[in-house]
A protein has these predicted regions:
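Hydrophobic helical membrane-anchoring modules
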Residues: 2-5, 183-245
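Acidic helix N-cap motif at the loop->helix transition within catalytic regions
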Residues: 22-26, 49-58, 102
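Short, acidic, metal-binding catalytic loop of nucleotide-sugar glycosyltransferases
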Residues: 29-38
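A conserved acidic beta->alpha catalytic loop
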Residues: 44-52, 97-98
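Glycine-rich, basic loop-to-helix element that forms the pyrophosphate-binding segment
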Residues: 65-82
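Short aromatic/hydrophobic "clamp" motif used to bind/position activated sugar donors
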Residues: 90
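Conserved donor NDP-sugar-binding/catalytic core segment of glycosyltransferases
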Residues: 101-133
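A recurrent flexible, glycine/aromatic-enriched loop bordering the glycosyltransferase active site
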Residues: 120-134, 141-159
């Protein structure tokens, strides 16, 4: 049988997941607004809820990477999509994300531009539910993403398959996988805003409030850049014993 050629307008979506049965259906419904064929790969880290069934009902592929680790899950999902040789564009999203209503037509216009595949693309971030402190944080993140070329994983990442492969793809890190990847990407190309806002669940900002959590995250990033083990930092971030990460 001849190898299937990649569809230039097919979108290959990779979603790392761990016990997201409550939020995953909303994102999967949003993704159905893509006006062309779409391939959805949910990479699970060992969920014990209904994430598998939900993914199957939405027509997505469900693969398992255990023990969980977002970098490992993202890398596995991308590799799976590339091996299928269907979509030329890869879109990485977190399972608790929500896409705006007209995201499909907006992204389609973007990738049809002749120069689009030269760049990597990210969404602006909206944290739900909204508070004044979170609005301020969103503004800081928008500036950081544009000026420093360092969007967070919560903002999603869209890039052509050829650019992903040239960059080396996601590293199998338990933490900081998003920053490590965009740092390598920024050495090859510019990361550009899509001009759309993606919503993320604000649960991670509830513990200690926005300021405290932002300072904790900044300290973790500083220690990572200084060379500390991502596994040790992940254990601290997720509140798990170092040996289980």
């Amino acid at each position: 049988m001849a190898a299937m050629s990649a569809d230039p307008l097919m979108l290959s979506v990779v979603i790392p997941c761990l016990n997201e049965a409550e939020r995953l259906p909303l994102l999967l419904a949003d993704l159905q607004r893509w006006p062309f064929p779409i391939e959805i790969t949910v990479v699970d880290g060992g969920s014990n809820d209904h994430s598998h069934r939900i993914s199957a009902l939405a027509g997505g592929r469900f693969i398992t990477e255990h023990p969980p680790g977002r970098g490992k899950q993202l890398a596995a999902g991308a590799q799976h999509s590339i091996q299928q040789n269907q979509g030329k564009w890869l879109l990485f999203l977190h399972a608790d994300s929500r896409l705006p209503r007209h995201w499909g037509s907006s992204v389609l216009r973007r990738i049809q531009h002749p120069d689009a595949q030269r760049f990597a693309w990210f969404f602006d971030l909206h944290i739900h539910p909204s508070t004044p402190a979170r609005r301020l944080l969103e503004g800081v993140i928008a500036l950081r993403s544009r000026w420093c070329q360092q969007p967070y994983g919560d903002q999603g990442l869209l890039l052509h398959r050829s650019l992903y492969e040239r960059s080396g793809g996601y590293a199998a890190l338990p933490l900081m996988e998003d920053l490590e990847f965009v740092q390598r990407l920024s050495q090859l190309t510019r990361l550009r805003p899509l001009g759309l806002a993606i919503s993320t669940d604000g649960r991670r900002w509830q513990r200690g409030g926005v300021l405290r959590r932002s300072l904790e995250n900044a300290w973790l990033r500083h220690r990572w850049r200084r060379g500390e083990s991502p596994a040790r930092l992940a254990a601290e971030y997720y509140g798990k014993p170092f040996s289980t990460i």
